[in-house]
Regions:
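A beta-strand signature from Gram-negative outer-membrane beta-barrel systems
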Residues: 97-99, 205-247
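Gram-negative outer-membrane beta-barrel transporters
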Residues: 506-508, 662-827
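Short, acidic, small-residue-rich periplasmic hinge/interaction motif at the N-terminus
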Residues: 30-36, 43-48, 75-81, 91-135, ...
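Short acidic/polar hinge/loop motifs at secondary-structure boundaries
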Residues: 65, 189-219
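Transmembrane beta-barrel wall of Gram-negative outer-membrane proteins
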Residues: 249-284, 290-370, 374
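Face-selective signature of the C-terminal outer-membrane beta-barrel domain
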Residues: 309-328, 344-528
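C-terminal beta-signal and adjacent terminal beta-strands/loops
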Residues: 643-646, 650, 654, 661, ...
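Extracytoplasmic beta-strand/coil segments of soluble accessory domains associated
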Residues: 145-190
Length: 955
């Protein structure tokens, strides 16, 4: 921690030295509509080299100071308009610039409908604008993953599919929690999932209204140190801002319907009182169109107020207040195919608010300072109403105390008979809040431009839900105990970061950009076993523009490199495993002389196992890349390696316990019974002679009970090669060809020793099974690897004169090889399957003593010398589900084709149509593991044939 602070101070002092030697220049002007000349207030002007920017005031004026001399690139953006870049050669202050933005339209010469590599960024960064989203009819933010290099389309683009974003990962089933480590933020506010008790997964994006999105930025490479609590990159969503026309969207797909309406209101003359953006979106998806009753609904409302203050003083203050909400969820109450009055309701309510103040004093020692506060509250209550029946009354054990208990209507109650409905409610209310302060310095030195930002973040995560409970506690099912989420401590985190972006120009038109940053996170969990933990995250990137000239074959050549460490905080599921209870019946009398039955149970609670040695999961990321522009053809190639260390993994812990079991008497109706709560001994009292009492004989039963403990697993490695080739436009055909793809390799092999046993079998001596095996990993396969080669070829024809754009995309998988692994497997077990023997085992009597498990030959010999021990130990052998479980599987190449069409009709109407797998490819693919040919139809390899149409109105 001390070294980190010293490094931060050193970087800051170096930045101050640079600032004192600065010779800055000023650029000012106006941003107006190209057709009407009206000012475009709240447009943004961004200096691309430093990522410093400003917001246009109500008169359309902007001023950006402290810019370096020489060539600088400015990007001007405004929602609904095509962005524009200005390249200026600054030798003195430049004023009076008039930037004329044209409305985004297919009549423009340049239109993008795919993910574009961000310019002037050393790390891999892709940008997807509104035109691309409309052309591809995005209804869920996670759908944009298909637009990345090598990305694959999904057939059913509906809200029923709660797919989580997992950057640079083939699937969310891989080890290392790839989706949990992929961060999502909307207008700078993190959409977190740390407060969930039921999963350790990425945040769901179904509550985010897509019709209100202006653009999406996807950082798959090294993220800025400004962003913490991640390990696999970040997705940044930017929503609409500024004065906009009334827009109405309607989308129709087989499983999904969507309608939205939005507008940016000018409050007062020339927006002197600010601008209010409002958007409402209704969307509904059905699970099955032949029985459209199980559905997911999204009712999203967005209100956003923006205002420029203190414009006259030359140091504008931008005030933004955002409020986003969603009322929706999944519902199956109306399904006539289900049992009468049975249903499942899952709320997906969200309320997110944010206040941001951005002040730009443009001083020598301070360029910009931003203060932001945000809060996110969710309601994920789930109700499940089930139909139950029982011919006899069953005991429900609800005690939380260890020992023997009698069904007396308190700790153990007797359930009803006949038919009834039972309503179970799982109440989860995650809360995330944060306070953020960020400052920026921007200056120019004699031979180098320098941009420094530093900040502090405070975030907290918790859950105010009640957990699982029942509407009628007398009907609470067996083994239910109350476990409230709102009693668990909140997780608090303070992040400190500093980042220095240095840029050195060369005489040949090239330049070198180096970004170095350091982040320190301090995590505190009060009243828990974890206390306070700290983590240090250094990150750095380099971008070398070797030369820049349009007079040679190589118009530009850019080399990039990067490294970084990113730390992912744990979820509440990881931090707070629940207490488990083992309930075993120790006595059942049958009906006694009074017509009653006596039931006794022994309860053994296994307290929540907190791992005080738990380490925070982190990733080490490395990147190398090259970009080139050769005669109008733009080429980008990136090589990456991501290693996830200390991933969060759940493991089973087995604890021995014992109790006294008493068999019932044959003539039960002649006695009454009492049970000792401490010893479990049963006393029978004769009805004919109450003085005759006898303690019934009992036997001691030895059992194991299990509980979950979260630990750190083995390192997971992902590496690959990504490429994008945008060929020069074929002017005669108005067509551009794009080839993108990725060569991806994943390897995860769990080497951590984990326990496993069966709790349902018995030993040779008749006792419940008491042996525990210790294996590498918690499955039959300790790990797996997978290599894929995906390539997409997209032909985009854009005819501006008729406002038409057509894209045809071929998605091809040329290579798919995967294999499960386990170094200790024995093939040919029982002639067909594979068997895995544990490395060690323990017994009920000595749970802490690990005994080496016999080898296959020793186990065979044991069968002759001690058949009982052999039979007991053989139960620990884990067997594969198929004979080809560990066989390398090579899939033959396969492909699908998508068609997208967008047509503008006049100035106010546009229509988009798309069809995935429109050829409905049903060819066969070959699997080497099974040596079989299987149809691609509904195989999951390619999307099913699917289509949709969207109508947009701008008034």
């Amino acid at each position: 921690m001390k070294r980190a602070l010293l490094l931060c101070i050193s970087i800051w002092m170096a930045a101050q030295a640079i600032i004192l030697s600065a010779q800055p220049y000023l650029v000012s002007g106006r941003v107006v509509d190209a057709d009407t000349g009206e000012p475009l207030d709240f447009a943004t002007v961004l200096h691309l080299e430093s990522r410093q920017g400003t917001t246009v005031d109500t008169d359309g004026a902007f001023s950006l100071g402290r810019l370096p001399g020489g060539k600088v690139s400015l990007e001007i953006r405004y929602f609904g308009y095509a962005s524009q870049q200005l390249v200026l050669d600054l030798r003195k202050d430049t004023t009076g610039i008039v930037v004329q933005l044209k409305k985004a339209s297919l009549k423009l010469e340049e239109v993008t409908v795919s993910a574009e590599r961000a310019e002037l960024e050393a790390s891999t960064d892709y940008h997807i604008d509104r035109t691309a989203m409309d052309h591809n009819q995005i209804v869920n933010v996670s759908d944009v993953m298909a637009l990345l290099p090598g990305g694959k389309s999904q057939g059913d683009l509906s809200l029923m599919n709660d797919e989580r974003l997992a950057l640079r990962s083939e699937s969310n089933t891989e080890k290392g929690n790839p989706a949990f480590g992929s961060a999502i933020e909307v207008d700078g506010m993190r959409i977190g999932n740390n407060a969930e008790m039921s999963e350790t997964n990425g945040a769901s994006t179904r509550t985010l209204s897509t019709s209100d999105i202006e653009s999406i930025e996807i950082v798959t490479g090294i993220a800025s140190v400004e962003h913490g609590d991640l390990s696999n990159g970040i997705v940044k969503v930017r929503t609409r801002r500024g004065k906009t026309p009334l827009s109405v969207d309607a989308t129709v797909k087989p499983h999904t319907k969507l309608v939205s309406i939005g507008k940016g209101f000018d409050l007062g003359r020339n927006s002197e009182n600010g601008i209010l953006n409002a958007n409402f979106e209704w969307a509904r998806s059905y699970k099955d169109i032949s029985s459209p009753y199980t559905s997911y609904t999204r009712n999203g409302l967005t209100l956003r107020y923006s205002r420029q203050l203190a414009q006259e003083q030359g140091s504008p203050l931008l005030l933004c207040v955002d409020l986003k909400g969603n009322v929706g969820g999944q519902n199956s109450t109306a399904d006539p195919d289900a049992f009468s009055d049975t249903y499942t309701k899952k709320r997906d309510y969200a309320l997110r608010g944010q206040i941001r103040m951005d002040w730009q004093p443009d001083r020598a020692w301070l360029s910009e300072i931003e203060l932001r506060a945000d809060v996110s509250m969710q309601d994920k209550r789930q109700k499940v109403n089930t139909n139950c029946n029982s011919a006899s009354s069953q005991p429900y054990v609800h005690t939380t105390e260890q020992g023997y208990h009698i069904a007396d209507g308190n700790t153990i109650i007797m359930g009803p008979t006949g038919y009834w409905y039972n309503l179970a409610i799982t109440d989860s209310k995650p809360i995330d809040a944060g306070l953020h302060l960020k400052a920026k310095w921007s200056q120019d030195w004699t031979f180098m431009s320098n941009y420094v930002k530093a900040g502090v973040d405070y975030t907290l995560s918790g859950n105010n839900g009640k957990g699982l409970h029942y509407e009628d506690l007398t009907l609470a099912t067996e083994n239910w105990r109350e476990a409230r989420y709102d009693t668990l401590p909140f997780m608090h985190n303070i992040g400190l970061y500093v980042e220095d972006r240095m840029r050195m120009p060369f005489r040949n038109g090239g330049n070198l950009q180096v970004v170095l940053g350091l982040r320190e996170d301090l995590t505190h969990i009060a009243k828990s076993e974890y206390g306070t933990a700290s983590s240090l995250s250094p990150r750095g990137t380099m971008r070398w523009n070797v030369f820049g000239s349009k007079k040679r074959t190589f118009e530009s050549l850019i080399l990039t490199a990067g490294f970084g460490k990113a730390v992912k905080l744990p979820s509440m599921q990881v931090l707070y495993p629940t207490t488990t209870y083992a309930d075993w019946q120790t006595f059942a009398s049958g009906t006694d002389a009074l017509g009653q039955a006596v039931y006794a149970y022994y309860t053994n609670p296994t307290r929540a196992l907190y791992n005080r040695d738990l380490k925070w999961q982190y990733s080490l990321q490395h990147e190398l890349g090259v970009e080139a522009l050769i005669k109008g053809t733009r080429i980008s190639v990136t090589c990456f390696r991501n290693a996830t260390h200390n991933p969060y993994v759940s493991s089973n812990i087995y604890t021995p316990f014992s109790y006294e079991y008493t068999a019932p008497l044959a003539n039960a109706d002649q006695y009454t019974y009492t049970v000792d709560g401490q010893t479990g001994k049963v006393t029978a009292t004769s009805l004919s002679d109450p003085t005759q009492q006898s303690v019934l004989p009992s036997e001691t039963v030895h059992r194991l009970t299990s509980n979950t403990k979260w630990i750190n697993g083995s390192t997971v490695v992902r590496k690959g090669l990504e490429w994008v080739i945008d060929f020069a436009k074929i002017r005669a055909l108005n067509t551009q060809i794009r080839v993108d793809g990725d060569l991806y390799h994943y390897r995860g092999n769990e080497r951590t020793l984990m326990a496993y046993t069966t709790l349902t079998q018995k030993q040779s001596d008749g006792q419940p099974y008491g042996y525990v095996g210790y294996y590498r990993g918690n499955n039959v396969a300790t790990g797996s690897y997978k290599t894929t080669l995906n390539t997409n070829v997209t032909a985009t024809t854009h005819i501006p004169v008729i406002s038409l754009i057509v894209s045809l995309r071929f998605e091809c998988t040329f290579l798919e090889v995967s294999q499960r692994t386990n170094d200790r497997r024995i093939d040919g077990y029982m002639g067909y399957y594979s068997a895995v023997l544990p490395e060690y085992y323990s017994t009920w009597a000595n749970p802490d003593e690990l005994v080496r498990y016999p080898s296959a030959d020793e186990l065979t010999a044991l069968k002759e010398t001690d058949v009982n021990l052999y039979n007991d130990l053989a139960k620990l052998i884990r067997i594969s589900s198929t004979g080809y479980f560990f066989t390398k599987d090579r899939i033959s190449p396969y492909f699908s084709t998508n068609l997208n069409v967008t047509k503008e009709i006049g100035k106010h109407v546009s229509v988009s149509f798309y069809a995935t797998n429109f050829w409905n490819n049903t060819s066969l693919y070959h699997s080497s593991a099974t040596d079989r040919n299987t149809s691609l139809y509904e195989s999951g390899k390619i999307p099913s044939f699917y289509y949709g149409i969207t109508l947009k109105l701008k008034l």
